[in-house]
Amino acid sequence: MKITSISVQQKNKERYNIFIDEKYNFSVDEEVLARYQLMKGKVLTEAEIEEIKQADMVRKGLNKAINFLSHRVRSEKEIRDYLRKQEMEAFAIDEILKKLADMDYINDLEFAELYTKTQIKTTLKGPRTIERELVEKGLTREIITQVIEEYSDEAQLENATKQAIKIMKRNNKSAKKMLQQKIITDLIQKGYTSELAKVAATEATSELDVADEAEILQKQIEKTMRKNKRYKPSIAKQKTITSLMQKGFSYDTIQSYLTENEISFEEEE
């Protein structure tokens, strides 16, 4: 089989169409063209053509991978998954990854270190969340253990407290006890240990005093009473107390407030 002509692709000047016996057969990257010294008149066997096509697949995949890496650093697994989505064959993926490693485009330890530092500085995620994300990105347990040590106890507490303050601002209608529990639960879900979550919750709510809680209770009582005034006095009172207890106020605190402020449900009927 003889190459009868070679033409540059119109949309990509770095790729060439190869015609065998006057018919289009395949296309190759400029680097592959030069490597295999493809030119008009050269005779190729079927095995040689298949080898050239495979080499071109690797070259094409390598270019795609480098472009993929140009946006940000990636783990080996992320690149492998990307190449699979590009419908690259297994042999090509393995060779591409080897070439990238030789070119220092892939280094999972450096990737994990950079990713962890970025998450610590730019997000309020806990260490367990970062660990889970690193697992999803294909990092080994050894690497994860090594890089997660960079998340110091001080940095964890600082980030957890910042997150706790955000949670507190979103839930400023609850009693302090309920608010602290909400903060602890949310922080655990965000990847912090229960011990650190408790410390952060205490730290974030440390400035809330009795006066603050009394003001919150007053607003909640007024709001709940308006909502329940369509009921009979006894039912309205029970519903109001139940609702307030669900927000973290104790029964005794509610009763004391109602008594001290001479709040009568009869008057709201």
Curated annotation (Swiss-Prot):
Domain of life: Bacteria
InterPro entries: RecX_HTH_1st (IPR053926), RecX_HTH_2nd (IPR053924), RecX_HTH_3rd (IPR053925), Regulatory_RecX (IPR003783), WH-like_DNA-bd_sf (IPR036388)
Compartments (UniProt record): Cytoplasm
Pfam families, A to Z: RecX_HTH1, RecX_HTH2, RecX_HTH3
Alphabetically ordered keywords of this record: Cytoplasm
Gene Ontology cellular component list: cytoplasm
GO BP term, example: regulation of DNA repair
PANTHER family for the chain: REGULATORY PROTEIN RECX FAMILY PROTEIN (PTHR33602:SF1)
Similarity remark: Belongs to the RecX family.
Role summary: Modulates RecA activity.
Protein name as catalogued: Regulatory protein RecX
